Regions:
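PRPP-associated nucleotide enzymes
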Residues: 1-136, 140-195
Length: 195
């Protein structure tokens, strides 16, 4: 049985409640059979792009992720394309000017044109070597997708102490990440929602 991953305490429970409402109204699809990235099927699905590309949703996500980062000394936030891209953008924007963070995203595979880089968003001379990175995810199930990003970032010489997800489906990600010495923090879990 997977280890339960309770949401970490946040400084603004009202923002958390508001985000729960926005996700419930915009992103939670019920009574539909979907295939998850993990390969499992589910009768509910979080289409988080509908929240991440919504003004209030993006603002709340950024605020609550920054709350989760408060106790960490972090240089960059990043994540795997596509789900993490809007999260990284809203978090780094909101981090300025108080605690400016760098940001990037990890491609699933390099393009065959352009810079052909696996990690995008860094200047040519910029490196993750020796940096501390927290990876972001919109929804986490088993952690398989974000572990690919962890491996890519570690290959560049960065440390990844933590992954922060907006919604943890509580299907084993915390245990799988722990095996790689990565803590999983969540803003919300599946138990917060009426399914």
């Amino acid at each position: 049985m997977p280890t339960p991953n309770a949401p970490n305490p946040v400084s603004n429970p009202k923002a958390r409640a508001n985000l729960l409402q926005v996700i419930s109204e915009r992103s939670l699809l019920r009574d539909t059979e979907v295939m998850l990235a993990s390969g499992a099927s589910s009768t509910f699905y979080f289409d988080m792009k509908r929240t991440a590309f919504h003004a209030e949703g993006a603002s709340l996500i950024a605020q609550l992720i920054l709350d989760q980062l408060a106790d960490l000394d972090v240089d960059y936030v990043g994540g795997l394309e596509m789900g993490a891209v809007p999260l990284v953008a809203c978090v780094i924007q909101r981090s300025f000017p108080d605690r400016p963070l760098g940001g990037f995203f990890v491609r699933k595979q390099p393009k065959d044109h352009g810079t052909r880089r696996l990690i995008e968003g860094l200047r040519q001379e910029e490196s993750l070597a020796g940096k501390t990175v927290v990876l972001l995810e919109d929804v986490t199930t088993t952690g398989g997708s974000v572990l690919k990003a962890v491996a890519a970032v570690r290959e560049e010489g960065a440390s990844v102490p933590c992954v922060i997800t907006v919604v943890d489906r509580l299907e084993g990600a915390a245990d799988n990440l722990k095996k790689e010495s990565v803590e999983l923090r969540s803003v919300l879990t599946v138990h917060d929602f009426v399914l």
